[in-house]
Amino acid sequence: MDEIVLAIPSAGTKVTRDILRICNQTECKLKVLPGMYQFITEEVSVSKLREVSIEDLLGRDAIDIDLDSVLGYVKGKTVLVTGGGGSIGSELCRQVAKYNPKCLIIFDIYENNAYDIQQELKKKYPMLHLETLIGSVRNTKRIESVMELYRPDIVYHAAAHKHVPLMEDSPNEAIKNNVFGTYKTARAADKYGVKKFVLISTDKAVNPTNIMGASKRMCEMIIQTFSRYSNTEFVAVRFGNVHGSNGSVIPLFKKQMAAGGPVTVTHPDIIRYFMTIPEAVSLVLQAGAYAKGGEIFVLDMGEPVKIADLAKNLIRLSGYTLGVDMEIKYTGLRPGEKLYEELLTKEEGLQKTENELIYIGKPLEFDEVHFLSELRKLEQAAIDERFDVKEIDSGIVPTYHIREEDKERDSAIYQEFCKLGRASHEGPVMEE
């Protein structure tokens, strides 16, 4: 037997995935027929047979969304998406555009990303009132001028630095962009009467071991603080890895294989949750419909995936033989990296919503006066490019634990830096 064809279009994603995992253990080539939806909507023939993709092994059944509830709060509204050119932000723009907003505003610091999604939406939705603006959420005057001019009803705040190892080496940038970019955008939303503010958060905010996760936890704390005193409904949506996003492992593995390998995995036991970008964004929109203010919505990410198994499957599906013409190299955990991620703390618990894939985590109590006081110290430390911002962060986020090896690494970098001498830095308060 040389080839296996899975020709059960009526099978759900889980059944298909389980069958493919068994078949993948053989040496046979694997092909699948399109699903039932394609049979109904398209002419399907043997020519439609395709190779099995890694997405077939990661996928889940179609996510059920209450379209009426999403339509009810997006249609006819002015919607601002910060970071609108990024992986999550651009998909937010795509899906919001389908619901006939009064005006959609793409706001991003990277002009090429913003231009790409602008051109895509102009072609697909020629009647859409679309504004594409370049600017930084770190710039108070810029973000406030946008809010004042366009008076958005809804803000999806997706602008953030998300790369864990890079932020470990540039912690002050994570603080400036993530923490105070969120603070300034949220403050502007409150000032100019935004009705709904949805923060895109991450599972790395739970018991963080890296500055990126700690910064996103502070973002959650910021919007929870605003929600207590503002007429704006401030909420956060927390989810794990999305495959296909900038910097995700699947594109990296494919590039490594195209270059002849090896495929690099940090640890044989590291696991992650995965969801497609469209799945995550559709649930973000649904969570926004449920929002009353102050909630942290947690998305059901499905079953965790061992990254080593993901690499092995991708090697197999790409036509290589592990150990013969493609190798896996284990490189060790990177600074700030965890073996596994958590979607919520034990204290947060879970409350169900109408959608079985969306839960609400119980907000953790914290001293808001102390929090705001520490934020001021953190702001000044980031402006001064100090090396102790991680320690200041750990005083603000009690669940943030810096790994000992990372402390030693940071200390060594600091000692070397001091030998070179430190140039003074003066500039406006985070108005870049």
Task: Name these PLM-found stretches.
Residues T26, T41-E42, H157, H161-E220, ...:
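Conserved Rossmann-fold NAD(P)-dependent oxidoreductase catalytic core, especially the SDR/UDP-sugar
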Residues M1-E3, P101-K102, M147-Y156, V164, ...:
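Proline-aspartate-enriched helix->loop->beta-strand connector
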Residues M1-E51, G135:
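Phosphate-bearing ligand-interacting subdomains
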Residues D64, S69-Y73, K191, M221, ...:
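Strand-loop microenvironment adjacent to phosphate/nucleotide-handling motifs in alpha/beta enzyme folds
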Residues R142, K184-A188, F274:
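Conserved mid-core alpha-helix of short-chain dehydrogenase/reductase
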Residues L133-I134, K176, Y330:
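Conserved residues in the N-terminal Rossmann fold of short-chain dehydrogenase/reductase
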Residues T82, F107, V155-A159, F197-T202, ...:
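SDR active-site strand-loop-helix element
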Residues S47-E51, E55, G59-R151, G349:
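N-terminal Rossmann/SDR dinucleotide-binding element
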